[in-house]
């Protein structure tokens, strides 16, 4: 689980990125940045990050989440988070970022909250 694997799938007009691995400085954050950039270039503006398989995220990974959120919002889109692990939820709470991101425990709830 050293690298970050990202698989994309569609649910209506929402792109879901199922992530497995670590979002860390270097490969993980670069993979996330590249995936988000490609989606925006394709005109996809509703993005749901499924973080159930993310075992670890460092400060660079947190920065990449914030950067992705900012880029998507600036482009008129929405970024939401799905299936936060307890560790990630605690980290986002401590950094006060849990108030910035919309996060959901199940996919159906997340999908129904896209506008």
Locate predicted features:
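STAS-typified acidic loop motif
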Residues: 5-34
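Short acidic-hydrophobic, aromatic-tinged amphipathic segments that line or gate anion-handling sites
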Residues: 102-106
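A short, charged, amphipathic alpha-helix used as a generic interaction element across diverse proteins
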Residues: 114-115
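Amphipathic alpha-helical interaction surfaces in cytosolic regulatory modules
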Residues: 23-101
């Amino acid at each position: 689980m050293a690298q970050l694997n990202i698989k994309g799938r569609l649910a209506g007009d929402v792109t879901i990125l199922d992530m497995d691995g670590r979002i860390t400085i270097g490969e993980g954050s670069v993979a996330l940045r590249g995936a988000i950039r490609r989606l925006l270039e394709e005109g996809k503006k509703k993005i749901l990050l499924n973080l159930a398989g993310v075992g670890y995220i460092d400060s660079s990974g947190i920065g990449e989440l914030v950067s992705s959120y900012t880029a998507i919002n600036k482009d008129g889109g929405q970024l939401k988070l799905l299936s936060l692990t307890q560790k990630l939820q605690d980290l986002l709470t401590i950094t006060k970022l849990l108030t910035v991101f919309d996060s959901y425990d199940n996919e159906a709830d997340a999908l129904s909250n896209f506008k």
